[in-house]
Amino acid sequence: RDVLGSRGLGDVYKRQITDSDSFEARDLEKAQFKTDNPFEELGVKQEVLEVPISSMCKESLKDSGLDNKSILRCKNMFALGLVCWLFNRSLAAAEKMLREKFAKKPEIAEANIKVLNDGYNYGANTHASTSTYKIESKAPKSKGLYTDINGNKATAYGLIAAAEKAGLGLYLGSYPITPATDILHELAKHKSLGVKTVQCEDEIAGCASAVGAAFAGALAVTTTSGPGVCLKSEAMNLAVIGELPLVIVNVQRGGPSTGLPTKSEQTDLLQALYGRNGESPMPVIAATSPTNCFDAAYMACKIALEHMTPVVLLTDAFVANGSAAWKLPNLDEYPAINPPYVTPDMASNWTPYQRNPETGVRYWATPGTEGFMHRIGGLEKSNETGAISTEPENHNKMVHLRQAKVDKIADYIPELEVLGDEDADLLIVGWGGTYGHLRLAMDFMRDHGKKVAFAHFEYINPLPKNTADVLRKYKKIVVAEQNLGQFAGYLRMKVPGLNISQFNQVKGQPFVTRELIDAFTKLLEE
């Protein structure tokens, strides 16, 4: 909102800068324009700043000694200077960056800096736009040491922190895949912290090796994207039936199949919830921002270790590659991680599937623990004894026990928080990496007199305990997500009778806040 000022969001999008030197007759003819005014022909309504950037750069650098090709490469810096004027930004940071980048080519650095200033001065001297903007820099909400971090690195750090908190070694079995590979790269740098990384021959081996590491007593993780989850599903199910702690990180990308490897979507939600054979319950957590990836990864590990279950952590390409200022955490402020280890006094009457009566969690006997030799596997087991069983009643009981264990996790996760007006006419609902866009849309609408509220889900399965109570308070609910309505359908199944509208886009791109505002405003008017 500080960027938008009093003019509002739409006004920011009414400026386009173009190099008028690029619109020569032959160029327009090649582009099949019928007139010499392509903007009018296309019906562009924004204010177009037509600036002869190429010719002005040539004139400015004619005595620089650079060849024509090198001079024209400076055009972007002229445009950047004009943008800095438009947004009332100092050129100091850009000048510093250019001097550092071209330290070995000072003549290139100085040429770029010269046209950078030319662009700024052009805007100031010609009053190139009818209005300018000011971006106010806010101080951090809390004091501390901050660094810039992206989602993949934050995920890696969250995994390391959880392993340290639990007193375990961290094992990553992975296979490179866009856009998740950077987690593997980052973790591989930290052997000194007890991290073991194995780049396996394929996705299946990556997950299967992690299941083995979980049985051996490590905090086990595998990282991938949607296509990789398809291949890992059988090994993931081995962790389900074996009731082993495993974290599966899915950095979602555009699909299906190879799809759009470098683009972002939220299309793997139902895959995370149900994309395995049999009744295969698995907790699902969705990170909401680059910095939240640390907390989400930490909590995924905590749930996996304390409840002896595989956990899916969903991020996406937008969150994974996006960056933000991150306050370095104090691990003393994070909750303890206490795996349900067997104790020596249990040895005399212990069985492999013996459970804690309160949580339904089976106890963890890592190999080498004296008196607790046992076996597990992918075949159905007899309740408690762990022997292979095909008895109908036993299978029915085991299916319900595994489901109840995951359902019980709702007692250990935060309740759903609602932001905005208590008497809102519309509740905006989102999940995962769309948090920032939806929050901005709500804030803008409230600033303009609309009564709206916002609830964003990080915990998907199980849902927070107060989910039904929250959602049933509102007459109108809109679920916005980057798929065709997967979470909306999931909510309808879990909380029947809701009046849910949907805002769905599957473009491989983040939401445009203006489009969200327009759609939500229209819903309010219906």
Residue ranges and their predicted role:
Residues 15-22, 172, 249-250, 455, ...:
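Short internal beta-strands
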Residues 23-27, 56, 204-207, 228-231, ...:
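Short gly/pro/ser/thr-enriched loop/turn and capping motifs at secondary-structure boundaries
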Residues 30-42, 265-273, 330-344:
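Acidic, Ser/Thr-rich peripheral helices and adjacent loops at domain boundaries
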Residues 279-302:
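Active-site/ligand-binding-proximal alpha/beta "capping" segment
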Residues 31-151:
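Aromatic-enriched
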Residues 2-9, 13:
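Single conserved hydrophobic/aromatic residue that forms the stacking wall/gate
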Residues 96-275, 280-282, 286-287, 506, ...:
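Thiamine diphosphate
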